[in-house]
């Protein structure tokens, strides 16, 4: 009973009005994007492709599915289709999930919230097209870069330092 009276008095003192409600809703409006990242390594370099929307080279990625099994299935199809490697020639291993808040290059610097799921792709048979430092497969311009090269690249470092650091720290 005491708790009920105390709650009533507190509610009367701290009125919750339309302005406060609007501010609370505005603060909750976090535009999130969930992306699954595929890290493919050959010796000490990682596979990147030219992401036209972001204007920089980036790891292969796809929108994250709701379940891990579905995510792996979708990523396998995406990676095989878009990068010209048969699904039987690689396996994906879940590594970690990381949240990030940063300005979006695609949305004029608007701060966006990201959740990245990192996968390692273990390639058993390297496609011939992938044997060059830079190559074109399907509609993708691809290249191999070391983590140090990525961090030294001003565009990659500015736009995706968080993702490069996640790969560096977890693989």
Predicted regions and their residues:
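Nudix hydrolase/Nudix homology domain
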Residues: 1-5, 24-26, 53-67, 126-171
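Acidic, metal-coordinating catalytic segment for phosphate/diphosphate chemistry
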Residues: 4-35
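Conserved Nudix-box catalytic region and its N-terminal flanking loop in Nudix hydrolases
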Residues: 20-22, 29, 42-86
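A short catalytic or substrate-binding loop motif that flags glycine-/basic-rich loops and adjacent residues
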Residues: 28-33, 41, 111-113
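A structural signal for well-ordered alpha-helical scaffolds and beta->alpha junctions
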Residues: 72-76, 112, 116, 156, ...
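A short coil-to-beta-strand element that immediately follows conserved catalytic motifs
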Residues: 86-98
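Active-site-adjacent beta-strand/loop module that shapes the phosphate/pyrophosphate-binding cleft
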Residues: 98-132
């Amino acid at each position: 009973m005491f708790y009920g009276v105390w709650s009533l008095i507190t509610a009367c003192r701290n009125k919750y009005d339309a302005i406060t409600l609007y501010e609370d809703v505005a603060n909750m409006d976090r535009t999130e994007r969930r992306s699954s990242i595929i890290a493919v390594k050959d010796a000490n370099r990682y596979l990147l492709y030219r992401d036209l929307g972001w204007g920089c080279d980036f790891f292969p990625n796809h929108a994250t599915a709701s379940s891990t099994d579905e995510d792996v299935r979708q990523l396998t199809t995406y990676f095989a289709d878009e990068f010209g490697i048969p699904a039987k020639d690689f396996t994906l291993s879940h590594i970690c999930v990381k949240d990030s808040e940063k300005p979006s290059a695609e949305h004029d610097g608007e701060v966006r919230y990201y959740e990245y799921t990192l996968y390692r792709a273990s390639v058993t048979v390297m496609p011939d097209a992938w044997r060059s430092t830079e190559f074109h497969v399907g509609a993708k311009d691809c290249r191999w870069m070391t983590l140090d090269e990525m961090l030294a690249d001003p565009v990659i470092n500015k736009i995706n330092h968080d993702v490069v650091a996640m790969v560096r720290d977890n693989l």
